[in-house]
Amino acid sequence: MVFLLFLSFVLSSIFLVPLVYMLNKVFLFNRNRVVNYDSIRKLALTRME
C-alpha cells in the first residue's frame, strides 16, 4: 500500500515537472518574468512541504 502511494507520487512528480516547465514557457510570453517565476517557485515549495 505504501509502495503504491510512493509510486503514484513519483509518477505524478515526473509528469508535473515538464507540465510546470511548459506552463512557465507559455507564461513567459504573456506575463512578467519575475512575478511568474516567484509564483511557480512558491507553488513548488508548498507542494514539497
From Swiss-Prot:
Q: Where is the signal peptide?
A: 1-22
- Subcellular location as annotated: Secreted
Identify the keywords attached in UniProt to this record, alphabetized: Secreted, Signal
First-listed, main subcellular location of the protein, grouped into a coarse class: secreted
Provide one Gene Ontology cellular component.
extracellular region
Protein name from the UniProt record:
Putative uncharacterized protein DDB_G0291508
- The source organism is Dictyostelium discoideum (Social amoeba)
